[in-house]
């Protein structure tokens, strides 16, 4: 029986308590009830209301520092495995799930004997696709999000597998972690999901895409810049994106074409530097350079 499967739902909070509470509320309304929320709180100063702290369906793991996405998820995964769950569902705190989402994921996993499944992800108002799977370009070393920005009503549900999953929402059978390992904590945040996807594929696993249910997502709400002069994303996010993309390519260098990778990275980084320079976004300019230097100095 699918209802017998015990699920750990790992949610990481950092700064956006209101979004986290809304996400938890949507999970608690789920038609599937055999779950426990593992809430990893990377925010030091604030605290959750009593109804969250005292809930038997929620376990809060409080960190003294912001441990990032990779390490915080690993904390939740290890706790979950220790407590005998069958599946782990990674879920961003800036999402709202449909009440049948978990049921649908478990059903597809059981029916297809599929161990890793990502659902369809829409933007917050549900009008457009945010993520319908991903495509890896092995020549240039790029990772495309498929169908992003396309109207939901025009979406054709004809794809069943994806090259890489997004850590925004993915269901993983716990046996996978025993075989493949945990997220690489050197990434901190960004590209750790692509890295894990590549490792999965190297070990012979496929990643399914489920499109008969979905969730809605605020994009990168917790990592947006608070400084309007610097634009939407913070300088640190640009640092991580530059550094981690190159780290990933170095880590899996045999999977990509060296000439294509160098050409793409040269154009990409120069474009960022020129754009930030002429827009007087000097903090971002410096962080892109720092990301490049740190990635070059990184040893596999």
What annotation goes with each model-predicted range?
Residues 35-43, 61-63:
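Short beta-strand/loop segment that forms part of the nucleotide-sugar
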Residues 63-83:
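Glycine-rich, basic loop-to-helix element that forms the pyrophosphate-binding segment
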Residues 85-96:
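Short beta-strand-to-loop acidic/aromatic patch adjacent to the donor-nucleotide binding site
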Residues 95-131, 135-138:
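Conserved donor NDP-sugar-binding/catalytic core segment of glycosyltransferases
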Residues 137-163:
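Short, flexible, basic/aromatic active-site loop/helix in glycosyltransferases
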Residues 163-172, 176-216:
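A short, conserved alpha-helix in the catalytic core of glycosyltransferases
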Residues 236, 254-300:
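Non-catalytic, C-terminal membrane-associated alpha-helical segments of glycosyltransferases
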